[in-house]
Amino acid sequence: MDTMNWLDQVKWDAQGLVPVIAQEAATGDVLMFAWMNREALAKTAELGRAVYYSRSRGKLWFKGEESGHVQQVHDIRLDCDSDVVLLKVTQLGHEPGIACHTGRHSCFFNALQNGAWQAVDPVLKDPESIYK
């Protein structure tokens, strides 16, 4: 497949980014939301592991480069409007169930309960010990 062709079909935003959802392939759990630029999406397809674009750092973010929580990519999908990417992944590493920098399985651990956001999923590992 021509790399330029499939990347050209993505509707990038004004900053050259596309939103990305990482979903656990085995369970269907939504793990996280992030951004990719063209280079990150191409690298993800090439390497078979998630590479995102960090807007705060202004550079590629190889998921797991600091935490060890790598995401092996099984499938890359583009939504019907071509403006959102879905990665179906297996979360790997020394704590394979952790995708979030807070030490939780998913970044979506807050639930609206009685008009307030409440953390409803447990911390699996203290983030202080993950990011040394």
UniProtKB/Swiss-Prot annotation:
Top enzyme class: hydrolase
Pathway assigned in UniProt: Amino-acid biosynthesis; L-histidine biosynthesis; L-histidine from 5-phospho-alpha-D-ribose 1-diphosphate: step 3/9
Coiled-coil features, chain-numbered ranges: none
Keywords, in A-Z order: Amino-acid biosynthesis, Cytoplasm, Histidine biosynthesis, Hydrolase, Magnesium, Metal-binding, Zinc
InterPro entries hit by this protein: PRA-CH, PRib_AMP_CycHydrolase_dom, PRib_AMP_CycHydrolase_sf
Record-listed Mg(2+) binding positions: D79, D81, D83
Family note: Belongs to the PRA-CH family.
Function: Catalyzes the hydrolysis of the adenine ring of phosphoribosyl-AMP.
Binding partners and assembly: Homodimer.
Name of this chain's protein: Phosphoribosyl-AMP cyclohydrolase
Gene name of this polypeptide: hisI
